[in-house]
Amino acid sequence: MVKTEVPDSIRELLPLTAAVFYILFVLAEGEKHGYAIMKEVETVSGGQFIMGPGTLYTTIQRLLELGLIEETSTSSDSERRRRFYRLSRRGRQTLEAELSRMESLVRSAQRRKLVTP
């Protein structure tokens, strides 16, 4: 991962909560609707983080307000009732900053022999 200067407006959001991290993480692959986000989070976390609808939609609302995700429109009649979300540019920068922070933490733990490389 290339080390770049993280803007203060993004740094102040770190560290991310698990719910925020996982939502940004799964949206990095492309737009998804709420239920798909919830199921993908469960999958990528290996079942270690299960997000209920209350947490999901409260967190989505907060991410929209922070400009980390955007609501997209769908042209499909069958999908019109569902709201789809995608990562914004700021959301991608925030996710990258958090991944870099986590990577640094893991390297530090490896140097201290707390985990094996």
Located regions from the model:
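Accessory beta->alpha helical hairpin/"wing" motif in late/C-terminal subdomains of nucleic-acid enzymes
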Residues: 87-91
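Amphipathic alpha-helical dimerization/coiled-coil segments
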Residues: 93-117
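Short, Lys/Arg-enriched N-terminal segment that forms or immediately precedes the first helix
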Residues: 1-12
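Beta-hairpin "wing" of winged helix-turn-helix
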Residues: 64-81, 86
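Basic amphipathic alpha-helical segments that dock to polyanions
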Residues: 56-63
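N-terminal helix-turn-helix DNA-binding core of bacterial DNA-binding proteins
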Residues: 11-55
